[in-house]
Each structure stands twice: as C-alpha cells, then as structure tokens.
Amino acid sequence: MRIEDVRKEIDKVDSEIIRQIAKRQDLAGKIARLKFAQGLPVHDEKRTRAVLDDIFNRAVEAKIDPVSVQKIFEILVAMSEERQRECQGDGNLP
C-alpha cells in the first residue's frame, strides 16, 4: 500500500466525520425546538457532564487519547448549544 492510498482513506474518514457533525447539528436544532417548547434552557450542565464523561470512557476503551477526544467533544457540545441558541433566535451563527 502506498502513502497516497492511505491518505485517500483518511480523506474518506474525514468526509464521514463532517457528515456526522452536520447530522449532529441538525439534531441540535430538533433539541432546541423541544427545549423551547418545554421552557428549558439551552445549557444543561448535568447532560454536558454526562456526555463528556461517557466520551472520555469510550475513548479509553478505544485506546485513544481520552483528553484529546474530550476536547473535541467540548467543541461539539459548544457548537450544539450555539445551534440551539440560533434556532431560538439568540445565536451568533451566520
């Protein structure tokens, strides 16, 4: 196998990651509508902590750097909350 072949595989994985992030953002919009209808705030510290703890543990199980993976998910959670604010008319997204 050549390095170019492996890079093409990485590019495919990267494209799938982007698609999954977009799907996650769409789901965040659905969550926003449900939270708004129920009078719930965008930020839910208990849920955020549970997500990040779970991600940390899954990264350990997968034998990848859990701290780095947790940082990535901190960004994803922040993106989700911003999307939720945007759906409720309070966000800063373009």
Show which residues each predicted segment covers:
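Domain-level signature for soluble enzymes in the chorismate/prephenate branch of the shikimate pathway
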Residues: M1-P94
